[in-house]
Amino acid sequence: MITLLLLLAACLLTCMGQVSQKFAVESWRDLPEGWALKLRSPWLWSALVCLGLGLLVWLLVLQRLEVGIAYPMLSLNFVLVTLVARFVFHEPIDARHWLGVALVISGVVLLGRHV
């Protein structure tokens, strides 16, 4: 059970890091050229923290699971980021993309039986 919770935590932290990156670059649109102001973005620092913590949790997952099982389960990030893209960023998602999401979920469920 702890392994599944760690895997879920790694997925959520990675997803939050990706979403924070998107918010960071969106917040840069109105900034002048150059990196000085961009590096002060709280979203950028949030992304770094989330991705760093996600890496540490991922290392704990790899201590408990075979990489051939663990890594494909990270594809849940594809599902999570797609949901955020649709409902937070209001990006259009076509039927083929939703089919891909369903297939990823099916694959994760099948792999989850090995955990």
UniProtKB/Swiss-Prot annotation:
GO molecular function: carbohydrate derivative transmembrane transporter activity
Pathway: Bacterial outer membrane biogenesis; lipopolysaccharide biosynthesis
Protein's name in the database: Probable 4-amino-4-deoxy-L-arabinose-phosphoundecaprenol flippase subunit ArnE
Gene for this chain: arnE
Family under the similarity heading: Belongs to the ArnE family.
Lineage: Bacteria, Pseudomonadati, Pseudomonadota, Gammaproteobacteria, Pseudomonadales
TM spans (from-to): 42-62, 65-85, 92-112
Membrane topology per record: Multi-pass membrane protein
All residue ranges annotated as the EamA domain in the record: 44-113
Summary of the function given for this chain in its UniProt record: Translocates 4-amino-4-deoxy-L-arabinose-phosphoundecaprenol (alpha-L-Ara4N-phosphoundecaprenol) from the cytoplasmic to the periplasmic side of the inner membrane.
Subcellular localization: Cell inner membrane
Keyword check for S-adenosyl-L-methionine: no
InterPro entries reported in the protein's UniProt record: EamA_dom (IPR000620), Flippase_ArnE (IPR022883), Small_drug/metabolite_transptr (IPR000390)
Entries under Pfam families matching the protein: EamA
GO biological process: lipid A biosynthetic process; lipopolysaccharide biosynthetic process
A cellular-component GO term for this protein: plasma membrane
UniProtKB keywords: Cell inner membrane, Cell membrane, Lipid A biosynthesis, Lipid biosynthesis, Lipid metabolism, Lipopolysaccharide biosynthesis, Membrane, Transmembrane, Transmembrane helix, Transport
